[in-house]
Design a protein with these regions (language model features):
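Conserved beta-strand
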Residues: 4-7, 14-25, 56
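ABC nucleotide-binding domain signature
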Residues: 31, 71-89
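The feature captures the beta-strand-to-loop junction immediately N-terminal to the Walker
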Residues: 33-35
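Conserved Walker
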Residues: 41-42
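Helix-to-loop junction immediately C-terminal to a conserved catalytic motif
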Residues: 48
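Conserved ABC transporter NBD signature motif
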Residues: 56-64, 73
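Q-loop/switch helix immediately C-terminal to the Walker
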Residues: 83, 89-105, 113
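Conserved ABC ATPase "signature" region
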Residues: 108-126
Length: 126
């Protein structure tokens, strides 16, 4: 479970997102939508520990996300930003990319692993 509790991000001395709270259960699908520049990507980047909120807290499975927990979270999660600059030719290669970056993972995931991720995301392989 991911819990956002009263999250506020401030950018250029202006609030980007204020007092956001939400709980996301394991396996739950969530859509973040809204105008550009209102904190959607920043919120997701905070779960990966790339940015921490100016106010509020984030809990993952009950643990407050801090510098210690970030290292543990990065071992079990992957994050692909919306502006991705690596030259992937297929969606399959894009999905495989985080596996190559994880510790104690084979250098390339099996085709079965990739197809399982396609199914979890509701996608069809090319």
């Amino acid at each position: 479970m991911i819990e956002f509790d009263n999250i506020t991000f401030i950018y250029d001395n202006k609030p980007l997102m204020q007092h956001f709270s939400c709980c996301i259960s394991s396996g739950e699908k969530v859509v973040l939508y809204g105008p550009s520049g209102h904190g959607k990507s920043t919120l997701l980047a905070s779960v990966a520990g790339f940015v921490l909120p100016d106010e509020g807290s984030i809990r993952i499975n009950g643990k407050i996300l801090d510098s210690v927990a970030i290292q543990q979270i990065r071992r079990i999660t992957a994050w692909l930003p919306q502006e991705f600059t690596l030259p992937f030719e297929t969606v399959e290669e894009l999905i495989a990319a985080p596996f190559r970056l994880k510790i104690n993972q084979p250098s390339r995931p099996t085709r079965e692993t990739i197809l399982n991720h396609f199914a979890r995301l509701g996608l069809e392989p090319e």
